[in-house]
A protein has these predicted regions:
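Basic-flanked hydrophobic alpha-helices used for secretion and membrane insertion
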Residues: 1-176
């Protein structure tokens, strides 16, 4: 489930946690698109817990996911495009789109706490920020905006079921 308002996300999370068919789940927040003319590919700035990062196949192979507000984990492809050496402790400055309709952008300098080998065949390269940073800086998206295609600030979940039997029905039940 993705592009959820805070209220819908809270309801869904309670449902997921109570569902006996769910083995585990991951959660995240989509902050916005990474904005830099040196990117020759799509970049998404997000918060993700370990399960969510795993669902994107973007877990750091060196270092870890961000814990502190000024930390970031990202693909080596992004770092290379910015001319930054993939190394724990290096600083990287990133700009992302807070709200595409209002053309609002935010630029911050982060300390690299993790990275992985990027794959240029993948359409979107991920930047993981801490939960604290995401909550502090996310756009307060409304349900109406989500319906109209503004996903910045929307919450999302990935769900692993204990088995794949009747997968569509299980997902339908959680989504109600």
């Amino acid at each position: 489930a993705q592009n959820l308002s805070e209220e819908d996300a809270e309801r869904l999370q309670k449902t997921i946690e109570q569902d006996e068919d769910v083995e585990r789940y991951g959660s995240g927040i989509f902050l916005g698109a990474g904005m830099d003319e040196r990117f020759g590919f799509s970049v998404e700035v997000r918060y993700a817990d370990e399960n969510m990062a795993e669902s994107f196949n973007c877990l750091p192979t060196t270092g870890r996911l961000p814990e502190k507000e000024n930390e970031v984990a990202l693909s080596s492809t992004i770092l290379e495009s910015l001319g930054v050496t993939p190394k724990i402790g290096e600083e990287v400055t990133l700009t992302w789109e807070v709200n595409p309709m209002l053309k609002q952008y935010k630029t911050d300098t982060f300390q690299i706490c993790g990275f992985w080998q990027g794959d240029k065949a993948v359409l979107g390269q991920m930047v993981w920020v801490s939960e604290a940073y995401a909550k502090e800086n996310r756009y307060p998206v409304t349900q109406e905006e989500l319906v109209n295609g503004i996903y910045n600030g929307g919450k999302e979940y990935s769900v692993w079921y204990k088995n794949l039997w009747n997968l569509e029905k299980k997902t339908e039940n959680i989504s109600k």
